[in-house]
Design a protein with these regions (language model features):
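Surface/interface-facing alpha-helical segments and adjacent flexible terminal/loop regions used
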Residues: 1-184
């Protein structure tokens, strides 16, 4: 049996499930409220305590969001990410962020297809939506946590994907959200 390869100093059995659930939560938080099932819990406190050492209160974040009510969530989401005379005030889709960079959506779809991630027809029109990108990252973490071999391929895929499709534009997204809705 060959040696197992993995990213140095990463205990996959501990970190992959936490990363997996965290990406799933952020995907749900950034999805359009019009697409979410109302009343579905965003997270349970059982696993969110595991990320407290990193200074993140995910249970509080999920509870605060759920406490705002669906109508308010839908109105605020639409005003920030969907409605605008010349497009949305803040682009939550990667291709909108990089209008001068062709092929973003195609590259995303190639990633999805290579790893067997299938978008339902409902979301196929927006493979570059931030919630879909986060859900795919959740999918890669899940595959890493459940893999018996080739763990490194999922870890490196996460690194490559996050570098290409999250790190490069989410800081700009955060700045634009803060400018449009200070303190949100």
């Amino acid at each position: 049996m060959g040696a197992r390869r993995y990213v140095r100093n990463r205990d996959t059995s501990l970190t992959a499930p936490i990363r997996c659930r965290t990406y799933a939560l952020f995907s749900a938080l950034l999805a359009s409220p019009h697409d979410l099932e109302t009343g579905a819990p965003l997270c349970d406190a059982g696993w969110t305590d595991e990320v407290r050492p990193y200074g993140i209160d995910l249970a509080g974040l999920g509870s605060a969001y759920a406490g705002t009510g669906w109508r308010s969530q839908a109105r605020d989401y639409s005003a920030l990410f969907e409605v605008g005379d010349s497009g949305p005030p803040v682009a939550i889709r990667e291709q909108q962020q990089f209008k001068d960079l062709p092929g973003v959506r195609e590259e995303l779809v190639r990633f999805y297809e290579f790893f067997g991630y299938l978008l339902s027809e409902r979301y196929a029109w927006a493979p570059d939506h931030l919630s879909v990108i986060l859900e795919f990252t959740h999918f890669l973490c899940y595959r890493e946590s459940s893999a018996r071999r080739d763990i490194l391929s999922y870890q490196l895929a996460q690194l490559d994907f996050v570098s290409r499709h999250l790190i490069n534009w989410t800081p700009v997204l955060v700045e634009r959200i803060d400018a449009a809705r200070p303190g949100s």
